[in-house]
Amino acid sequence: MTREGAEAIEQTSQRAAETPFARLVRHCVERILHGGGDSSSDELDFGIATMLGLLAMPGAFATIFLLDKYGSFFRFLRGEGKFDAYAASLPDEYFFIVLAMVVTGAVAIWKWDSLIPDHRDYANLAPLPISSRNIFLANLTALLLLTGVLALDVNAASSVLFPLMVCGSESSFAYLLVFLGTHLLSVVLASIFSFFVILAILGLLMAALPYRVFRTCSVYVRCAMAIFLMALLSTSFAMVRFVQNPSAASQLLMKLVSPLWFLGLCQSLRGVAGPAFASLGRFAVVGLATALILAVGAYALSYRRCFTQSAEAVANLPSTGGVAGEHFFRSLDKLFLKTPFERACFRFSLRTLSRSESHALIVGGFTGLGIVLASQTLFEAARAAPHGSTSPSALPSVDLLSVPLILGYFLLLGVRFAFDIPVLLRANWIFRFTVNPETGECVPLARKIMLTFLIPLLLIVCLPVCVWRWGWSMGVTHTAIVAVLCLFLTEILLVRFRKIPFTCAAPAFKSSALVTVVFYFLGFAIFTSGTSTAERWALEDPLRYLVVVPALAGAWLILRRYRGEMTELDTRLTFVEQPDTAVEVLDLTFRR
């Protein structure tokens, strides 16, 4: 290509990028990525480069963890002979398809409010000399572009590393290309299918329900979809074993699991699919086309109703909680909300959690993850239970004892994480002017908010189920132990807490964030497996409680002593969380 031709192409592309429609598409892309509000809303958000990097990480790490399975050196050490890459990689192929659907679906759920134009877009775009048809086409184009970019980015690392790892011992380059191409096509189409299904659900709900009803049920629908995605991911390994040994009655169930469709498509393209997988591959093509048609149709219906008629729409929920809500708060005032600070901030916090979709989604997501892991633990405990161990007189296993601890851990962790995400940060001036920063009431307030979520779990779920399963003595004892351990976890999570929930700027990303995540995983293992093992050990001989109880009391005293030795600066109320300085200087020259 000549220099003049390259310059002509560059000028043509620049002119195309400056057309009104291209600018409108760019505006729609930025609105979807950064939300519909103003840039100073201080919500949890990421830059484009950071977000794309984070989305590619799960697939990359999952591939690295498979090195010991597919590495030729490790297979040589294990004494493995002939290696069939297609058969050996079938479980992991299904896992990567599920992972692609889960990550893409999670992004669609998180950006739920930004996928379809709302009243803010109507206020900004309707007065301009732009037809509604062009606005609709620009939004649709932006959605299709982001869907493609998202599907490619989520699977970029795994689509290269996984085929190279599996086919590393193969001498044929064509074999690698076939494996890579079929894997890439399957996971990308699975990601697109997941995004379109969620978009179709969103559009159908917005088109069918009144706006207030949609806003009310939106959080519950998103939490339900998040729980479904987590359940799909957590059961991926069991599903592959089920597919490898199918029965006649399981053929219908296989057709209802959408990730199996794309696994069948992948195997069909490779030419190694049996009759069952070949039929599932046809389901993938039909399902993807159906999801695309439903998504575009539902998007058009919801666009017409929620954008062109959004001048009459009300974006906020009612400001009052009704008579029942007032009675609830008055009852809590008499029980344990003693000071005006606690009463006001408690109402503010609960109403934030119930009305803010982002905060409710955080708590619901953590709780949903706890439900999935608890259900999986319960299933494994029931399957591993020997004959005769299901009688009420038998001692419960360690897995059964850990189920309520898993639920409590993720519920408390979700509420604590939501505390750090601000809501309308510019409105915290009322707290700055009216609250004395020296009162030290932040920890008691946060503790009571977390107990408000914990107590129903203990009294409505844990106690009745344990009493029904093991009788009053064992049920009350186990519920009391769970309550004490959850209280101890609450105190640990609030050790350095010195803010009013939802009023402090979100903490910046720190280099120690990965270490914090590792500590959360270790804490989960200790809090669930460690404590349930100690409880099971004590149940075998009640005298062993003389060891368990003093150990727990000693840990409690250590925590109280650590909190008592904190300086006034560490307990003073703050509204701006200062990042840790990388380098501390003494300033011995006293220069100013």
Predicted regions, residues:
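Anion-coordinating catalytic cores for phosphoryl-, nucleotidyl-, and glycosidic chemistry
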Residues: 145, 205, 428
